Every structure is written in C-alpha cells, then in structure tokens.
Regions:
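Generic structural hydrophobic/aromatic packing signal, biased to beta-strands
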Residues: 12, 41, 73-79, 135
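Metalloprotease/metallohydrolase-associated module, dominated by Zn2+-dependent proteases
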Residues: 93-164
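Hydrophobic, Leu/Ile/Phe/Ala-enriched alpha-helical segments that form helix-helix packing faces
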Residues: 5, 77-81, 122
Length: 164
C-alpha cells in the first residue's frame, strides 16, 4: 500500500501519538491540500489495536504491524480516490428523508456510506476475511468500552434494519 500511495504522490507520515482527539480515537487520517496529500498514521494507536486484538485470537489469526498499516492505508486510499475523482460515495447514493411535514421534505446524504465503502474496499484489496472495522469492535469489547452484550444487541438491531 505504501508503494501505491507513493505512485499517487500521497505522502505517508508516521506519527508517534495515540491519535486521540477529545473522545475520538483516530488510527489514521488523510489530509488533502493543493500542495500535497498526506496520510497520517498514528503508530501508538495502531500498535495498541494490534496488541489488543492479538491477545484475543489464535496465533494463526494474529495481525502483523505491516498488515495493520496496510489496512489503514487502504482505507484512507479509498477516501483519496473519492477526492481525486470527485465522486463521493454518499453523493452517489440516493439521499434519505430526514424530516417531512406535509409537503416540506428535508433530505440528506449518509456520510457513513463512505466509511462503509472504504471498509469494503480495504477488505477486497487486501483479501481480508472480514470488514476491517471488526478489529475496532474487538478492541472496544476487550478494553471495556462496549460490552459483548451491547455489541450483540447492535448486531441484532442491524439485522432487523436489513430485513425491514
């Protein structure tokens, strides 16, 4: 992935920080400018994710540092492609109605669609078994930020939404 970033003139910057801003944990981010495009990789955050995940799985399923880096580079590279082509996933999809009163209707795009597409892109490009956000969910469960019960409830809720 680093080679692909270099070929597309995307600078990859490794930052020895946790990537935590207020209550949001960043693992990587891409910044666009006319001068240069930069993907920042928050090494401490990725190492923490990798170590926490690796405690939970069998030896054959453990993540390497290179795999964790490539997962996050692929994810951010998808956002680069959206930006470069000016085709943002949330704009391609039909907007949803967020409010309606009589004939007044307010619609919006769903920004989360771009994140989901980036996860799917990453999974396909790297040949992963699962969408890569599973690593974040394992991390959140293992660190106690969400309970396994709450996670299972989320999955049940998602299934109901997909069926309806």
């Amino acid at each position: 992935m680093i080679k692909l970033c270099n070929e597309n003139e995307i600078k990859v910057e490794f930052v020895k920080k946790s990537g935590k801003f207020y209550s949001v944990q960043f693992r990587a981010e891409i910044n666009f400018s006319k001068k240069e495009n930069i993907i920042k990789i928050y090494e401490d955050s990725l190492i923490d994710l990798m170590n926490t995940y690796n405690k939970m799985v069998e030896e054959k399923d453990k993540l390497t540092y290179e795999e964790v880096i490539n997962i996050h580079l692929a994810h951010e590279f998808y956002h680069y492609l959206e930006h470069r082509d000016k085709k943002y996933t949330n704009d391609i999809l039909e907007p949803i109605c967020t409010f309606q009163l009589l004939s007044f209707k307010k619609e919006a795009s769903v920004l989360k669609c771009s994140e989901i597409a980036a996860h799917k892109f990453c999974k396909e490009v790297l040949g992963l078994k699962y969408l890569p956000n599973i690593y974040d969910y394992v991390y959140l469960i293992e660190t106690g930020e969400i309970s396994l019960t709450n996670f299972n409830n989320m999955i049940t809720s998602w299934k109901k939404e997909l069926i309806s």
